[in-house]
UniProtKB/Swiss-Prot annotation:
It is an enzyme of class 3 (hydrolase). Its EC number is 3.4.11.1, 3.4.11.10. The keyword Cytoplasm applies. Residues 487-502 have a biased composition (Low complexity). Keywords: Aminopeptidase, Cytoplasm, Hydrolase, Manganese, Metal-binding, Protease. Residues 487-519 are annotated as: Disordered. GO terms for molecular function: manganese ion binding; metalloaminopeptidase activity. This is Probable cytosol aminopeptidase. It catalyses: Release of an N-terminal amino acid, Xaa-|-Yaa-, in which Xaa is preferably Leu, but may be other amino acids including Pro although not Arg or Lys, and Yaa may be Pro. Amino acid amides and methyl esters are also readily hydrolyzed, but rates on arylamides are exceedingly low; Release of an N-terminal amino acid, preferentially leucine, but not glutamic or aspartic acids. One of its GO terms (biological process) is proteolysis. One of its GO terms (cellular component) is cytoplasm.
Amino acid sequence: MNFDLKTLELAAAAAEKCDLLLVLIPEGFTPGQDALSTLAALALKNGDLLLKAGKHLQLYQVPAVAARRVILLGVGDGTARAVRQALLALGAEIKKPQTKRLVLCFAAALKAGVASAAVQAVAEASYVYTTTKSKAEARSLSRCVLGVPDAAGARPGFDCGVALVAGVEFAREWSNRPANHATPSLLADAAKTLGRLPHIQCKVHGPAQVRRLGMGAFVAVARGSEQPLRFIELRYSAAAKDQAPIVLVGKGITFDSGGISIKPAPEMDEMKFDMCGAASVLGVFRALGELQPAINVLGLIPACENLPDGRAIKPGDVVTSMSGQTIEILNTDAEGRLILCDALTYAARFKPAAVIDIATLTGACVVALAGVRSGLFANDDDLAVSLYEAGEAALDPCWRMPLDDDYADGLKSHFADMGNTAGRSGGAITAAKFLQKFVAGMRWAHLDIAGIAYKSGPAKGATGRPVGLLVHYLLAQAEAMAQQAPVAPAAPAAPAAPAARPAAKRTGRSQGGLKRTAP
């Protein structure tokens, strides 16, 4: 699908030839004298249109309007959140087969984040998964035009939104694929395709290399599957070489049966989504390739299956992690933290500015936060605030959870340095406390996305979250780093003329000012 941005007032929008013209009208709308304004004013006066977000009035073959259909759409207070809500409420109309060309016309100036939110909402509403269907109907919408009062002012947000659509849909695609179509090897192949984008390189480690690295916990989880593990390493390098990278670590369990501690059969099919953390890292890199911010980012994805087999780990087994710490496997279904702990240890060698792991880690987080917010755990307050603010800006929110030391008491083991689970109570927190044992000396955050990575029921499928949160965080960090870049010294002043001589005539020489240089 193609997105276009243009300056378009309501008067000119009437001449736009399209299958569907959406006129987005906020509260406090002041109508003009054009056909669409008159139409909206009459609908409001007669009570046929309300401006609460999502309320709408659909019209056909409107005189003096070129569009086949017109929908007057209320967008409430006109904020990014309200615009997103309104467009998603109209998803069925956007997704109709006859809607191939869509024009969105904003009846008032855009508020912060609206252009990006609108692009993403249209993409989400029209998304169709087709990869493993023999006769699937592909997305019918081929072009969407955003008509705004000031295209130049909306351009940065629009471009960010288009890049986020690319990243989110890449993540959704790989999350939605069945496990036999998204094995660790296939996931690694997907990562390699990202290496074609600007500033991105990809390296894939196989089982022998992972064993040589000493990733005993990761190797132990993968033993029960015939599919070989993969450790994926993505690098986005667009800043100075000496700038410390931000590391993203994504959990890549491409199917989680629970292992010997096997899960109940109902809804086990959804355990293909246990690699949504990995998919979100891939999605972030896809977006970075479009946006090309001046920052260094490293993506690490430990990918494997968790299956029962004669070689699989058993409850009571003790394994040695890459850090040298030993772990008693009390529950083989607490496997995500085992592959993450080795990846976190590996991340330390890059001396990162921050490390963020992303994982569908615990059902306890779903109980705590449902499908609204990711669970955020962090050992650094500034990092936690930055991620929270990024989530709010991206409409991809998270909520900080506690990390009191007392929560780690349940991880004590009689036979190893720690157990891999501490029971049901506070399960999301104790899982984070386990990971915290492997991030000494690093600024670290953990996003538990078990509740927000995918949906069950009639709308079953991956959401692509938290790609938006992570990209907004990285863009904010790139901007902050650019502002902190060293200031070039001013050119030395010309020597003063000798006092005995007459003053020289002043020329039109330009004077060099202070110049900020990007890292």
